[in-house]
Amino acid sequence: MQKTKEKRAILITGCSSGIGYHVAVELDKLGYQVIASARKMQDVQKLQKLGLNSVQLDLDDTESIRNAFQQTLEISGGSLYALFNNGAYGQPGAVEDLSRETLRAQLETNLLGWHELTTLVLPVMREKSEGRVIYNSSIPVSYTHLRAHETNDLI
């Protein structure tokens, strides 16, 4: 189900659960044209059943990022008021226990995926002389030792 009413369009990444899911639902209630993205198709379908516009977006995959961006423009009529970069993941384990490859994979998603999507979105926002790019990062409140995903907050 696609909502076509003219509203401020917001693309939100990582809407399968947690903050992304709740932000998408609440902004939709407030009247924004939400495009909720998720990596897995089953999550996209779950979001669509709620009445949200939803696209599949895997931040590790350039083709997926580009396809989701194009679908977002089709849904929104070519404009985008905001990008809410929320989709990410944390690799469990103590920093000293994680390999370079594991951390590289995490940075690929949590930094480079966001960057690639943002570089696609900015020209659309500049054309309209308005827009917002929001980066969200969260970590659990307490840990007994530093986890790899906590290092993202140090960057």
Indicate residue ranges for each PLM-predicted region:
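Conserved glycine-rich cofactor-binding loop
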Residues: 16-17
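Rossmann-fold cofactor-recognition segment
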Residues: 51-63
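A hydrophobic alpha-helix adjacent to the NAD(P)-binding/active-site core of NAD(P)-dependent oxidoreductases
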Residues: 54, 98, 106-107
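Conserved NAD(P)H cofactor-binding loop of Rossmann-fold oxidoreductase domains
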Residues: 86-91
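Substrate-binding pocket helix/loop in short-chain dehydrogenase/reductase
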Residues: 94-95, 102-104
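A short, exposed helix-loop element centered on a Lys and neighboring polar residues
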Residues: 118-119
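Conserved small/polar residues in nucleotide/adenosyl-binding loops
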Residues: 144-151
